[in-house]
Amino acid sequence: MVRYMQEHFNSRPEELVAAIGPSICVDCYEVSEEVAEQFREVFPEDVLQPGKAPGKYQLDLWKANQSILLRAGIPPEHMAVTNVCTCHNPEYLFSHRASHGQRGNLAAFLMLKESWVPECLTGIKKI
């Protein structure tokens, strides 16, 4: 997404703001050795923790996504993580694991605060 914004909107990564929304947390996301190995190849950082069972690992998707954003040039101070686990909040959010395969949808509504609107957009009529 960052690369797309650079190519199509001339965005500079250091000026972008990113949010990581609700998803499964590290405590709830157990993965196999095979999945863990694939993540180790891409993320040498600490995105895996020892699992609760032998040969299992807890995967931190929030850290993995922050790592992707850092590599893309987004400064850490321009990132926000909701720290809301979909598995811990099934009454509000859908979780594939918590619902044993039943699925739903999540949506995000984003907007620019007037103070954040870049100069190139200041002439756009407000709704």
PLM regions: where:
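Active-site microenvironment for binding and transforming phosphate-containing groups
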Residues: M1-I127
